[in-house]
Amino acid sequence: MSEQSAQSVYHRSEQLLKEARKSHRGVFLTGPNKIEILTDELPESSFEGDYFITASLGNCRCASDAKAIRQFDAHARVPSGADRIALGHETLQIILQAPEGSNLKKGELVVITPGHSSEPIDPLEFKTVSDGVLAALGYSYRFLGGLRQFNRIPSAAPEFVRSQGFGNLFNPVSPKENTSLISLAHAEPFACNYGTNKHIFTLDENGNFIYGVPPRSIVTYLSGTARMAMINLTIVASVADEDLPNVVYVTGSKSKLDEMENYALVNDLRNRGTRVVLVDRKDPDILNKLTEFGKSDVVWTNYASQETYNQAVA
């Protein structure tokens, strides 16, 4: 980043920090199947130096939000008795205030890791308590979520999250002129899929584990027309031609599959030698269609049901 750009970002961060002291709006979960746009304020103590203050720049909708929306505080990550929870866990933020010694500075862009605790904690202070909650971004906090304008995070949070096995709370990104903020917010679902693929295992001829999607394998995406499946397939396709899957099966609704016929990703895979087979999930002959060019080595799905299990083991 040029010196002029850095000064501009710093100046904008100063402006936003002043705005963060005022009332501002956010999208909050306030009950089962109840979402409201509300005005809120960060506590004045947030600006005394022991908190990170951030501004939300981008957020991606995730299907896993739906479960929290349906269940509210019956959800394991939503505190019991909460009156409002800020939604949004796939988010890009800009640092407006950082505690001394934090290694972050005003104006930095960061993606926030969504998983925060593997044991019950007080979500306001990031301290373990017996009656706490398994805290996570977009599920557990009033003052932190990608769909509120300004956020506060205790200074102890980064080290606590690291100690819980979730890695870095803040993940700095380097913006480029041709990269949109929404694209950067996709870093979180991309990381989910990258991690999933890295830890997939198959068995070799000797019965040993082989981690990762094997070269020249047959990969199936059941109900695979959604965004997460396409991100996963993008990662699978990011290898040399000789390591691409031989066959990729994708099931979904006919309307979605018709759209996929024109996807650049699908056309690129076909041009590079992968057979991409799109199968209507309502096809009565679906089990035969999913084995027409060989049985699957790897099956990906977001939907655990008897139907998808039958398709996976076909």
Give a label for each model feature.
Residues 26-36:
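Extracellular beta-rich ligand/substrate-recognition surface
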Residues 75-82, 138-142, 146, 265-278:
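N-terminal glycine-rich dinucleotide-binding loop that anchors FAD/FMN and/or NAD(P) in oxidoreductases
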Residues 203-219, 223, 228-230, 234-247, ...:
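Glycine-rich cofactor phosphate-binding loops and adjacent beta1-alpha1 units
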Residues 43-59, 73-124, 157, 167:
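Glycine-rich beta-strand-centered segment in the early N-terminal region that forms part
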Residues 7, 15-27:
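Short structural boundary motif marking the start of a folded domain
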Residues 78, 117-216:
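NAD(P)H dinucleotide-binding glycine-rich loop of Rossmann-like/cofactor-binding domains
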Residues 66-74:
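Short Gly/aromatic-enriched secondary-structure transition segments
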Residues 110, 161, 299:
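Receiver (REC) domain switch-region micro-motif
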